[in-house]
From Swiss-Prot:
Its main location: cytoplasm. One of its GO terms (biological process) is phagocytosis. This is Actin-related protein 2. Component of the Arp2/3 complex. It comes from the Eukaryota. PANTHER family: ACTIN. Belongs to the actin family. ARP2 subfamily. Functions as ATP-binding component of the Arp2/3 complex which is involved in regulation of actin polymerization and together with an activating nucleation-promoting factor (NPF) mediates the formation of branched actin networks. Seems to contact the pointed end of the daughter actin filament. GO terms for molecular function: actin binding; ATP binding. The gene is arp2. GO terms for cellular component: actin cytoskeleton; cell projection; cytoplasm. ATP binds at residues 158-160, 212-216, 303-308.
Length: 388
């Protein structure tokens, strides 16, 4: 085992776990962050897969129609530690096939994560798995590393939570960080609701995965909502057909752009917040005046929920509109000097992991950066000061 392969990088998302080793260009394994327990133990095997009392990740996803599915993470925070440990067991022993006692681990976490959550995570890594050393990195900072930047604003939207995080010279700025509890899972739920209004009922946990696939295949963000609504109403150009697992074919029309709209208008999913465009504008506008130009120039998208076609151009349009109304106060001359650039790297779905793999490779021999096991045994949770 080389030194790099002894450093595990694990990005635990609300929807998916991306795990692998330092220096790799792609996660060694990506699987759903879900735990399933059989509803009925009527048979031992199904579709050549053994039905076990606890099923995790890909195997749970495969048999999801027969299982009671739970997600250990919600809004980026671990809510169920027992299930989280099942997910980590699956990660280390089934997927990566490593002995944690020989390895170091780099974990990721969302900004504004509760301290208790972070302390418990370190405790589990050292006491249950016996890792030699651990490091916890903030996801947004890793995204910028992967993009080759030290300063910028990261719009990180995964399955459970969306964060807008300004990072200056490699340090995230917590006082300017904005959090929006609308992300991929909410878009899927909203799409279920829109399809329900059309008479298609999806209510089991298995159906949730089906609708998620519909969302990933067909949804996009509309640049001009009025135009999209007219197109949906007066023509059939937006209609796409999707074949459900039971063979039924359903048409998807206006729902394609209506579902992701909840990210720009959270009131649609009963969240009291402004949309993602206004949050980015607000966060940059409250930053020091001499950093704003650089922030506007480096708005980096990250996470699976930024993959919708049309999202980068709509975000740019929203930011420019708000700048024109609130900063330029309608002055078209000052708008000519305003530069706003949205960076949408093609591999942004895995940006956090890629940044983690880069950082872990740089740090692997530098003991000063890591929290090691002996320090943890001596100091307890206070050892976290090394990371933050």
């Amino acid at each position: 085992m080389t030194d790099s392969s002894k450093v595990i990088v694990c990005d635990n998302g609300t929807g998916f776990v991306k795990c692998g080793f330092a220096r790799s260009n792609f996660p060694a394994s990506i699987f759903p962050s879900m735990v399933g327990r059989p509803i009925l133990r009527s048979e031992e095997k199904f579709d050549n897969v053994e039905i076990k009392d606890i099923m995790v990740g890909d195997e749970a996803s495969k048999l999801r129609s027969m299982l009671q599915i739970t997600y250990p993470l919600d809004n980026g925070i671990v809510r169920n530690w027992e299930d989280a440990e099942h997910v980590w067991n699956y990660t280390f022993f089934e997927k990566l096939k490593v002995d944690p006692k020989d390895c170091k681990i780099l974990l990721t976490e969302p900004p504004m994560n509760p301290l208790a959550n972070r302390e418990k995570m370190v405790q589990v890594m050292f006491e249950k798995y016996g890792f030699k050393a651990a490091y916890i990195a903030i996801q947004a900072v890793l995204t910028l590393y992967a993009q080759g930047l030290l300063t910028g604003v990261v719009v990180d939207s995964g399955d459970g939570v969306t964060h807008i995080v300004p990072v200056y010279e490699g340090f995230s700025l917590p006082h300017l960080t904005r959090r929006l509890n609308v992300a991929g899972r909410d878009v899927t739920r909203y799409l279920i609701k829109l399809l329900l209004l059309r008479g298609y009922v999806f209510n089991r946990t298995a159906d949730f995965e089906t609708v998620r696939q519909i969302k990933e295949k067909f949804c996009y963000v509309g640049y001009d909502l009025e135009l999209e609504k007219r197109l949906a109403l007066e023509t059939t150009t937006l209609v796409e057909k999707y074949t459900l697992p039971d063979g039924r074919v359903i048409p998807i029309g206006a729902e394609r752009f209506e579902a992701p709209e909840c990210m720009f208008n959270p009131a649609l999913v009963d969240q009291e917040s402004v949309g993602v465009g206004e949050l980015v504008f607000d966060c940059i506008n409250k930053a020091d005046i001499d950093t704003r130009a650089e922030f506007y120039n480096h708005i980096v998208l990250s996470g699976g929920s930024t993959m919708y076609p049309g999202l980068p151009s709509r975000l740019e349009k929203e930011i420019k509109r708000l700048y024109f109304e609130r900063v330029a106060k309608g002055n078209k001359v000052s708008m000519q000097k305003f530069k706003c650039r949205i960076e949408d790297p093609p591999r942004r779905k895995h940006m956090v992991f890629l940044g983690g793999a880069v950082l872990a490779e740089i740090m692997k021999d530098k003991t000063a950066f890591w929290m090691n096991k002996s320090e943890y045994e001596e100091q307890g949770p206070r050892v976290l000061r090394k990371c933050f």
